[in-house]
Amino acid sequence: VSEAIIRNIAIHYEVIGHEGPWIALTPGSRRPYNELLNLSKEIASVGYRVLLHDRRNCGSSEVGFDASASEHEVWADDLHELALQLNALPLVVGGSSAGARLAILFAIRHPKATQGMLLWRLTGGLDAVNHLAQEYYGQFIALAQNAGMDAICQSEHFRSLIEARPSNLNKLKSTPVEEFIRTMTYWRECFLESSTLPIVGASEEQLHAISSPACLIAGNDVIHTPVTARKAAKLLTNCEIHENVVTHYPDDQLLKEWDRQEWKQAEPKLAKIFTAFLKNHSIQ
């Protein structure tokens, strides 16, 4: 477990494996990377190096609010800089949900640095966008407007970041509330713009322009719908899609929330599918 200063932010990271091509995997939401340790070890065991990191404002990394781009673009550029420092380019990029968004934006913004994509539980659709825009941004904008940065520090998510890295408390308290609200508002606007896009964060043209091979495992809940996965798979020029990794439900009977236990139990399947895909594309 190590740290690097990436664009003035301390980023907590870990490399699993000692040799072979580099793969970066990222979890969903703003969760820490620990949940991907077992999957990463399975993939690394057949000759890969897996880079895991806590994104800014996640896990044990430092908080930092950059309104120069959407949150997912900021994360994608942070990962590129981290991989550059570790001499880990080109990368196979992957992840679930928000981590899959990061991977796709990495491929869009850094095509020469991208060797392939391993994606699962892609997010898309109006319901998902509205629900997540409130969860990721709206609730924090309202808190900051009503009760300032003290209330942000006491919120469940940011409290967990302070527990993981106590210096985040001072950094949050010294962030001007106007700057925090401005950044969160801009990130929310970027997110809401995705309501008509095939997936959150990328247009049809952007997806179609990605030339790296992609392996995509469809979700089975209302936020990560099979329809979203199918749309993305059609638009990506070189993509294989798997719809039978977790329980398959009709499109009008999807789970209301993703089943963490089911995905945890499916990890050996994911590892098998992903490593077979990499070998098929001579990434070995």
Predicted features, each with a name:
Residues 104, 108-109, 114-145:
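Flexible "cap/lid" loop of the alpha/beta hydrolase fold
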Residues 239-284:
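Catalytic active-site module of serine/aspartate enzymes centered on a nucleophile-bearing elbow/loop
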Residues 95-99, 103:
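Gly/Ala-rich beta-loop-alpha elbow adjacent to hydrolase catalytic centers
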Residues 210, 216-218:
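Short beta-strand/loop motif that positions the catalytic acidic residue
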Residues 222-228:
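Conserved alpha/beta-hydrolase "acid-adjacent" motif
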Residues 52-91, 257-268:
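Active-site loop/oxyanion-hole signature of alpha/beta-hydrolase fold enzymes
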Residues 8-62:
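Conserved HGGG/HGGXW glycine-rich cap/lid loop of the alpha/beta-hydrolase fold
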Residues 171-203:
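Hydrophobic, aromatic-rich cap/lid helix
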